[in-house]
């Protein structure tokens, strides 16, 4: 298919690593839930299982030759109230991941300052705190909470607000971008399936369009949303910026991007033609310097 990198599911529950995720095993030939949200994260039984599971998983990934191309997670979106619990959960398995990339989406810089997380992925409305602190090789993400000022790709948002993310990622040399909602066709907590053609907000739990970027098509093939097409244009903008940079310099490209004012994750031209005209200029500059 062409997949090069692989993301492994979180080993503890979202928002603080308080519990075990749902784990189903074959017991005497029958499927049975052996751990779940009723299991404490520090449970000796769960930690023993988890350590055995991780050891086997890493062996399997090594046999496949992809162990260094995997991203591992502890818990999704912990906050400062979860520092102690998250740290305890991570320490229970961290020795198994020496030399591997362990990262989590989180927006409190205290996790980084205290050395609890070495590779944070902050949200776009908080990432500048990490940039200003000097964190290197940053990734960033957005989801249902990033609805003020910053770029996002909700159905209700104009396309320029979607596409502008390319200039943000380029300016701050962001190494990766994370987004959860590719094809989540369920309501909150996955209690029932929804029809994304008719119900665009996950049955009232997320802004319309947040939970998916493609629609289900014939024979299981995805149908691209306009939002995904525009987001792809943002990625192509980055490629164009990088190409011009290779012919000139980073500062040269940024002078063009910020010709009408400074660009930040929260500050950018709120008009349709800005990014289109910018791309025309960049394309012309590439042609000029490629002669």
Residue ranges of model-derived segments:
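Aromatic-lined carbohydrate-binding surfaces of glycoside hydrolases
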Residues: 1-100, 104-115, 183-188, 259-263
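General secondary-structure edge motif
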Residues: 37, 148-150, 221-224
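Catalytic-core region of carbohydrate-active enzymes that cleave or remodel glycosidic bonds
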Residues: 118-203
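Pol beta-like nucleotidyltransferase catalytic core
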Residues: 189-291
């Amino acid at each position: 298919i062409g997949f090069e990198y692989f993301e492994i599911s979180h080993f503890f529950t979202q928002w603080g690593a308080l519990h075990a995720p749902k784990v189903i095993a074959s017991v005497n030939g029958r499927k049975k839930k052996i751990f779940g949200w009723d299991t404490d994260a520090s449970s000796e039984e769960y930690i023993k299982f988890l350590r055995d599971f991780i050891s086997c998983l890493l062996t399997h990934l090594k046999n496949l030759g992809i162990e260094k191309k995997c991203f591992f997670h502890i818990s999704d979106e912990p906050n400062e109230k979860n520092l102690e619990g998250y740290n305890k959960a991570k320490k229970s398995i961290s020795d198994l991941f020496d030399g591997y990339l362990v990262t989590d989406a989180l927006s409190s810089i205290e996790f980084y300052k205290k050395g609890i997380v070495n590779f944070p992925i902050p949200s776009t409305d908080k990432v500048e705190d990490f940039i200003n602190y000097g964190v290197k090789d940053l990734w960033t993400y957005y989801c249902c909470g990033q609805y003020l000022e910053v770029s996002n790709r909700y159905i209700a948002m104009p396309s320029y607000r979607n596409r502008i993310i390319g200039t943000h990622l380029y300016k701050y040399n962001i190494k990766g971008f994370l987004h959860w909602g590719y094809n989540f066709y369920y309501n909150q907590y996955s209690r029932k399936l929804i029809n994304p053609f008719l119900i665009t907000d996950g049955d009232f739990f997320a802004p319309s369009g947040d939970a998916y970027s493609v629609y289900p098509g014939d024979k299981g093939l995805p149908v691209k949303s306009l939002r995904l097409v525009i987001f792809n244009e943002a990625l192509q903008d980055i490629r164009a910026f990088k190409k011009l940079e290779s012919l000139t310099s980073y500062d040269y490209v940024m002078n063009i991007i910020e010709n009408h004012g400074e660009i930040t994750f929260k500050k950018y031209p709120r008009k349709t033609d800005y990014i289109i005209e910018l791309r025309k200029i960049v394309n012309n500059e590439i042609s000029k310097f490629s002669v």
